[in-house]
Amino acid sequence: MRHDPMTPSTFDLFADAEPEQLPRREQIGEQSCVLRGFALPWLDRLLPALEAILAAAPLRQMVTPGGFIMSAAMSSCGTWGWTTDRSGYRYTRNDPQTDAPWPAMPAVFLALAQAAAHEAGFADFVPDSCLINRYVPGAKMSLHQDKDEASYAAPIVSVSLGLPAMFLFGGFERSDKSQRVPLLHGDIVVWGGVDRLRYHLSLIHI
């Protein structure tokens, strides 16, 4: 499960926004879909839980194995947290900044992830890690696959909060053409099964 939030002071940007007339559920692959506005009913519980996590494990810009500073700031919660440094990409049980365990995954995170996965056709999903990415305008990751997990059996559940974004969903080779999928506050993308290793990235646009 992943979250792409802005800072708490920017959540109210969407208070008066009118979402585009997009399908409630949009299939973007054989086993991948966008669930429009799926997270919105959960926000009253989701956002305070998110703030508590970031107070315990603040966002930070990590360094890639190649020595580059990532433009997206990150944190994690759950049994495992994703991290990167000059030693490589990996999951760790402890936050490298404090050597303390990552914050426990809040019950609302678990429930939302399971509800979205079930809606997308993935029953019995039990996430043990949540990567939190904060993108600001101009920040992005390169087109990539999520390959650091011990197993690819579970789907990816990605929750978008804050500014609109363009999600690029590609094929199984970096050179494959990517779909451009607009995402709004509260949208969730789920992909797994035969689509689990498709290339993807998110871009913030305003």
What are these regions (language model features)?
Residues 134, 151-166:
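Short, conserved beta-strand element in jelly-roll/cupin
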Residues 204-206:
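Conserved small/polar residues in nucleotide/adenosyl-binding loops
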Residues 2-74:
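N-terminal auxiliary "cap/dimerization" subdomain that precedes the catalytic jelly-roll/cupin core
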Residues 164-183:
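A short beta-strand-loop-beta hairpin characteristic of the jelly-roll/cupin
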